[in-house]
Amino acid sequence: MAIKKFKAYTNGRRNMSSLDYQANLTGHAPEKSLLVALPTKAGRNNQGKITTRHQGGRLKRFYRIIDFKRQKDGIPATVKTIEYDPNRSANISLVVYRDGEKRYILSPKGIKIGQVILSGDNVDIQVGNHLPLANIPEGTFVHNIELQPRQGGIIARSAGSSAQILGKDESGRYVILRLKSGEVRKVLAINRATVGEVGNEEHSLVNIGKAGRNRLRGIRPTVRGSAMNPNDHPHGGGEGRQPIGRKSPMTPWGKRALGVKTRATKKASNQFIIRRRKETK
């Protein structure tokens, strides 16, 4: 998808860019049977307390029900549209099965309108087809990867993401994947994945340009702790611009912010990670 840049009529538009949706999307209205109302939470829980800061005030939107499981085996589906989804970075495609059922799927890179895709154990290695990892050859890029059988895709679902199949382990029970982050991990060979990469890979190149666009997305300003009062943040207070006055930076709740491991050391999935993503940097 091409990047569209704007003339510098104002300072906000000087470096702003966006994706050229008209050149790549079909422009159809979303399928009403696959829409669900999406209430706004503004980062609050059921008590009205803020649990996630810097959220609120976004545009209203509907949630598109996405089929991450792809369990209609052996029934051909025809790609009808490539649409914009406000709830994710990737585009989505409306597919119509031969029995008449309509579903949304993540739109893979290179998929075409009118293309026929399949799900099943022994389908062809073609972009958009969904099959077990054990039946996909080495070197193939896949997305929408399951972590548990029939759970639905969990890994590699955002725009431009994918994982490469490196091979199988000695037992043949697991398939070894290399993720975009550089992490190498094992996944059960009976888990399914979709062949190809997720489309809309230029999403990461977009420059927001001005604060107003982030407000429409529901992202509120992030205020520095040192600019607050001492009753609002451990870094706050002082006459003018002062150091934080502590040995290490703190979170708003008084915990150390840097150098603390955020992943559980005894997490069960550690046994499946062959190489951590940080070891590749």
Swiss-Prot record:
A Pfam family the protein falls into: Ribosomal_L2
* Keywords of this entry: Ribonucleoprotein, Ribosomal protein, RNA-binding, rRNA-binding
Q: Which Gene Ontology cellular component annotation is one that this UniProt entry carries? A: large ribosomal subunit
Q: What InterPro entries would the database entry show?
A: NA-bd_OB-fold, Rib_uL2_dom2, Ribosomal_uL2, Ribosomal_uL2_bac/org-type, Ribosomal_uL2_C, Ribosomal_uL2_CS, Ribosomal_uL2_dom3, Ribosomal_uL2_RNA-bd_dom
The answer to whether the entry has keyword rRNA-binding is yes
Q: Looking at the record's lineage, which domain of life comes first?
A: Bacteria
Region entry Disordered: which residue ranges? 222-281
Q: Does the keyword rRNA-binding apply?
A: yes
Q: Which GO terms describe its molecular function?
A: rRNA binding; structural constituent of ribosome; transferase activity
What is one GO biological process annotated to this record?
cytoplasmic translation
Note the PANTHER family from the entry.
LARGE RIBOSOMAL SUBUNIT PROTEIN UL2M (PTHR13691:SF5), RIBOSOMAL PROTEIN L2 (PTHR13691)
Hey, which family's this protein in? Belongs to the universal ribosomal protein uL2 family.
Role summary: One of the primary rRNA binding proteins. Required for association of the 30S and 50S subunits to form the 70S ribosome, for tRNA binding and peptide bond formation. It has been suggested to have peptidyltransferase activity; this is somewhat controversial. Makes several contacts with the 16S rRNA in the 70S ribosome.
Entry protein name: Large ribosomal subunit protein uL2
Organism, by scientific name, is Metamycoplasma hominis (strain ATCC 23114 / DSM 25592 / NBRC 14850 / NCTC 10111 / PG21) (Mycoplasma hominis)
